[in-house]
């Protein structure tokens, strides 16, 4: 992979790099671009890449806005990765919470993951990806009346990603509301 030789002469400053292509995270090879970022002279802390061919009809930036809420890269990855997708570097790395320091989404996702009352409340939060995660957790918790809630949310939301999350979850439920 001659393209990684470029990284021996530069210092990438991105703390997190997300590769959305096949083989960019092939850590098992002697030379891969994700490793070049991590082990080079730059300041990259964590990368995400795919080791082999990856499906093309995926949603690679799903929940990406949660990173602005201080969600750890590994925690985000747990919700979006496919079998061939990997974190290379520090999965505990996170950006500063610039959305709402009073909202600890890491804690919500791990400690309060079964708290449907909290997730219902977060459906009204002004951040689209927080709303998407709330829908996802209600789905995982088998919340009663979810197909109707997803249909209602789809019809009312001003956020495209929230509407997409509703369609995705309705599809996964094989719901006639879709």
Predicted feature locations:
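Short, small-residue-biased leader/transition segments that mark boundaries at the very start
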Residues: 3-6
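Hydrophobic core positions within HEAT/HEAT-like alpha-solenoid repeats
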Residues: 134-135, 151, 166-167
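Caspase-like cysteine protease fold
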Residues: 60-144, 163
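Catalytic-core region of carbohydrate-active enzymes that cleave or remodel glycosidic bonds
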Residues: 11-49, 53-57, 62-82
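Active-site proximal loops enriched in glycine and acidic residues that flank catalytic Cys/His/Asp
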Residues: 20-23, 49-52, 80, 91, ...
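Buried hydrophobic core positions in alpha-solenoid tandem helical repeats
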Residues: 118-120, 149-152, 178
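Solenoid-like repeat scaffolds
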Residues: 123-125, 152-159
